[in-house]
From Swiss-Prot:
One Gene Ontology CC term in the entry: cytoplasm
NCBIfam families: PRK00197.1, proA
GO BP terms in the entry: L-proline biosynthetic process
Protein family according to the UniProt entry: Belongs to the gamma-glutamyl phosphate reductase family.
Pathway(s) this gene product operates in, as recorded in its UniProt entry: Amino-acid biosynthesis; L-proline biosynthesis; L-glutamate 5-semialdehyde from L-glutamate: step 2/2
Organism: Azotobacter vinelandii (strain DJ / ATCC BAA-1303)
Enzymatic class: oxidoreductase
Reaction equations catalysed: L-glutamate 5-semialdehyde + phosphate + NADP(+) = L-glutamyl 5-phosphate + NADPH + H(+)
Keywords, ordered alphabetically: Amino-acid biosynthesis, Cytoplasm, NADP, Oxidoreductase, Proline biosynthesis
InterPro entries: Ald_DH/histidinol_DH (IPR016161), Ald_DH_C (IPR016163), Ald_DH_N (IPR016162), Aldehyde_DH_dom (IPR015590), G-glutamylP_reductase_CS (IPR020593), Glu-5-SA_DH (IPR012134), GPR_dom (IPR000965)
Keyword Oxidoreductase: yes
Superkingdom of origin: Bacteria
Annotated function: Catalyzes the NADPH-dependent reduction of L-glutamate 5-phosphate into L-glutamate 5-semialdehyde and phosphate. The product spontaneously undergoes cyclization to form 1-pyrroline-5-carboxylate.
Protein name: Gamma-glutamyl phosphate reductase
């Protein structure tokens, strides 16, 4: 790491810590004013955003980025519209900061409760998608946190243009510019510095490929909110309603292939497999899904079904590929999910209350569903509004991380001159 990068990141960290103290006492109205003003600045800066993004796209093509990466990098007019609306949606969300709950009188006469407060300074490390700059900045600002955003080098010009709009919004509301800072160096040493400053940064949220997240999880000296994989399952129970099962299993895989809450493995109880798998096989093939199965599922899914390897059961495809396995019991299904899954989202289709309760209790995932598609694992669908990501960890935030997940609780105590005897 060069001294200059370390000095630069230290300056950002110090400024963010100071800004976080201002944000902790900032009113909801003032935060909303900053978000609305940033939205207006984005709207006014469409041409500048397009020009900056064109620079990144040209550099990406010259550097050999594939079409999928270029698509994620592109700031189309529709995506700029989405960013503007995203800022306004966050402004409309309830502010969790300052909420006091569970107030109760203790035998001593004091009142004890919990107050929701910001985490402080949040570092965001992400790749490719410039819209993450807006998503992360808006959620951190509304939850009273200062943020340092380190986007991918391939999006540097786009991120800087977006940052200028955010700074205009902050200035309009009278908030410090350091409340939202975008790292303006492409030197990779900046990431190492950001994740190694516990005196300035309270939590890191990585958004990107598995390699990035594994590196940050391994090297960070501050807590990390993350998920590594989205290996999601649907289990069709012996007591499933067949129509519901087919509908859920179809949607969980084919509504979209790339998201982290898309089903990657379908488990089917042997008692219903002969009725469920043939029609599902037809549906999947019609939608271009490659099927990989165990011996029993291959017989029922028909010609063209490939043999599933051991590696398939623990693979996140993010593609039109599905692993299928026939199991003999609910116990076997739960054991498979807990062994091969990523603790993200898993669903059971069943009419048995007993089986549903067992599945909910024993599957060790951040979201567990009954008779619903895994695609519902989403902050908007859960009523959280926007989300900064999904956490599969068990401490602090778990599942979709919205505004409340970017805060913590502290105990507050009220007395009237009370002393402990």
């Amino acid at each position: 790491m060069t001294e200059s990068v370390l000095d630069y990141m230290t300056r950002l960290g110090h400024a963010a810590r100071e800004a976080s103290r201002v944000l902790a006492r900032t009113s909801t109205a003032q935060k909303n004013r900053a978000l609305e003003a940033a939205a207006a600045a984005l709207d006014d800066a469409r041409e500048a955003l397009a020009a900056a993004n064109a620079q990144d796209l040209a550099a990406g093509r010259a550097g050999g980025l594939d079409e999928a990466m270029l698509d994620r990098l592109a700031l189309t007019p529709a995506r700029i519209d989405e960013m503007i609306e995203g800022l306004r949606q966050v402004a409309r969300l309830p502010d969790p900061v300052g909420e006091i709950r569970d107030m109760r009188y203790m035998p001593s006469g004091i009142q004890v409760g919990k107050m929701r407060v910001p985490l402080g300074v949040i570092g965001i490390v992400y790749e490719s998608r410039p819209n993450v700059t807006i998503d992360a900045a808006s959620l951190c600002l509304k939850s009273g946190n200062a943020t340092i955003l380190r986007g991918g080098s391939e999006a540097i010009h786009s991120n800087q243009a977006i940052a200028r709009c955010i700074r205009l919004g902050l200035a309009e509301a009278g908030l410090p510019a350091a409340a939202v800072q975008v790292v303006e160096t492409t030197d990779r040493a900046a990431v190492g510095a950001l994740i190694g400053m516990p005196e300035f940064v309270d939590v890191i949220v990585p958004r990107g490929g598995k390699g990035l997240i594994e590196r940050i999880s391994r090297e960070a000296k501050v807590p990390v909110i993350k998920h590594l994989d989205g290996i999601c399952h649907v289990y069709i129970d012996s007591a499933a309603d067949l129509d519901k099962a087919i509908r859920v299993a179809d949607n969980a895989k084919t509504q979209r292939f790339a998201p982290c809450n898309t089903m990657e493995t379908l488990l089917v109880h042997a008692a219903i497999a002969a009725r469920a798998l043939p029609p599902l096989g037809e549906i999947y093939r019609a939608k271009g899904v490659e099927l990989r199965g165990c011996p029993r599922s291959r017989e029922l899914l028909g010609p063209g079904t490939l043999e599933a390897s051991e590696e398939d059961w623990s693979s996140e495809y993010n593609a039109p590929i599905l692993s299928v396995r026939v199991v003999d019991s609910l116990d076997e299904a739960i054991a498979h999910i807990n062994r091969y899954g990523s603790h993200h989202t898993d669903a059971i289709v069943t009419e048995s209350f007993t089986d549903a309760r067992r599945f909910l209790a024993e599957v060790d995932s951040s979201s567990v569903m009954v008779n619903a598609s895994t695609r519902f694992a989403d902050g908007f669908e859960y009523g959280l509004g926007a989300e900064i990501g999904i956490s599969t960890d068990k401490l602090h935030a778990r599942g979709p991380v919205g505004l409340e997940g970017l805060t913590s609780e502290k105990y507050v105590v009220f007395g009237d001159g009370h002393v402990r005897g």
